[in-house]
UniProtKB/Swiss-Prot annotation:
Membrane-spanning intervals of the chain: 20-42
Function statement: F(1)F(0) ATP synthase produces ATP from ADP in the presence of a proton or sodium gradient. F-type ATPases consist of two structural domains, F(1) containing the extramembraneous catalytic core and F(0) containing the membrane proton channel, linked together by a central stalk and a peripheral stalk. During catalysis, ATP synthesis in the catalytic domain of F(1) is coupled via a rotary mechanism of the central stalk subunits to proton translocation.
UniProt name for this protein: ATP synthase subunit b', chloroplastic
Origin superkingdom: Eukaryota
Region forming the signal peptide: none
Subcellular location: Plastid, Chloroplast thylakoid membrane
GO cellular component terms, A-Z: chloroplast thylakoid membrane; proton-transporting ATP synthase complex
Keywords annotated in UniProt: ATP synthesis, ATP-binding, CF(0), Chloroplast, Hydrogen ion transport, Ion transport, Membrane, Nucleotide-binding, Plastid, Thylakoid, Transmembrane, Transmembrane helix, Transport
Length: 157
């Protein structure tokens, strides 16, 4: 293989690297044409796809944010309803316990009254029976006394 060395002096002598002839303008025109073709074929569709994806993502983020706000509102609403329901349940339980205690107290009071009446009735019945027995015994004592007296009188007479 043969190597050819470029003589740097020969490039500089005839205008060299900075020779402004038709080639430079053709390359510039070619660059502009390639840029516009790439812009039409490649960059615009890609930028449209990227923009549409950004819009899609933005819409989804907005929807997600809206759904999150709605979910938070519903959560707060249901938590308040739950707190209210718990308070009502506690109130109902307390009321039921109070009513049950009042009912039990009323039943106990009624049973005590009935027991007291039964005791009084029994005491009155017992008192009547006692008085009857005493009266009967007094009569028998009188009769026995009379008999003893009569026997004693008959013995002494």
């Amino acid at each position: 293989m043969q190597y050819q060395y470029i003589n740097s002096y020969s490039l500089l002598a005839a205008g060299g690297l900075f020779d402004f002839d038709a080639t430079l303008s053709f390359i510039a025109l070619e660059f502009l044409l390639l840029t516009s073709v790439l812009n039409l074929i490649y960059y615009q569709p890609i930028s449209k796809v990227i923009d549409s994806r950004e819009d899609y993502i933005r819409e989804n983020l907005n929807k997600a944010s809206l759904y999150l706000d709605q979910a938070n509102e519903l959560t707060k609403k249901y938590e308040l309803e739950l707190i209210t329901a718990r308070k009502e349940a506690i109130k109902m339980v307390t009321t039921s316990q109070t009513e049950a205690q009042e009912f039990v107290n009323a039943q106990i009071s009624q049973a005590q009254k009935e027991a007291q009446q039964l005791i009084q009735s029994s005491m009155m019945q017992f008192e009547k029976e006692k008085n009857k027995a005493i009266y009967s015994l007094e009569k028998q004592v009188e009769q026995l006394s009379e008999q003893i007296k009569n026997k004693l009188i008959s013995i002494y007479i």
